[in-house]
Amino acid sequence: ISNPISSEMTDMRPSIIPGLLMAASKNQDRGIFDLRLFEIGSSFNGNLPGDEFLEASGLILGNIFGRNAYEPLRVVDFFDVKGHLLHVLDKLNAPINRLSFKRNAPSYYHPQRSAIIQLGPKIRIGEIGEIHPSILESFGLKGSAHAFTIFPENIPFQGSNSSARQAMKISDLPSSNRDFAFIVDEKIQVDAVIAAIYSVDKKLIEEVSLFDVFEGRKAH
């Protein structure tokens, strides 16, 4: 690029994944470790006009579910990400039952915990896997991370009767997580407490969940 925005953006990107890893690192620096990031955009495998291609990539770190009172924490694994990927491909009306998972994913993935997704012997639909530990270390990331990439232009879309959905408006406010403790009568159901919290501001409060319960005299 002859006039880059910064010294770190002098070359056209060959993949979206490094940008997602950088975003994840910035989030971890701010104390956010359960992350679901994605981007859809152009990447480049050369300097010619025809070397541009479209990709959709996702990155997942941390626990599969947030803190809650019903089940222990569990770190995201390969099969969780595979489920997300197949769900996305299904929504794109891709021929799921004709896809195959094979070795030889890019080197930024773990060699034994990654795969390329193919349709037939030649058409590459995408990639999936655990990010290599050395890559995570270079970005200063803690814990494991999994990613996937889809190449929409390679998918032979099937017919769909679904109607288009309107894009959600993205808030211009930074996210903020808070833990609160309430002392309530044991007859009050948790749904009533959650509903009361949501009613304070339905636009700004995105999610409310119960992550622990203390009962009896020891709770005071």
Regions found by a protein language model. Give the residues of each.
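Extended, well-folded interaction surfaces typified by the phenylalanyl-tRNA synthetase beta subunit core
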Residues: 1-38
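Conserved catalytic motifs of ABC-family nucleotide-binding domains
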Residues: 58
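Short acidic, glycine-rich loop/turn motifs
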Residues: 28, 45, 117-121
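Generic, well-ordered alpha-helical scaffold segments in large soluble proteins
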Residues: 4, 19, 23-27, 43, ...
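Electropositive phosphate-/nucleotide-binding environments in soluble metabolic enzymes
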Residues: 14, 18, 52, 79
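A carboxyl-terminal module marker
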Residues: 37, 51, 65, 69-220
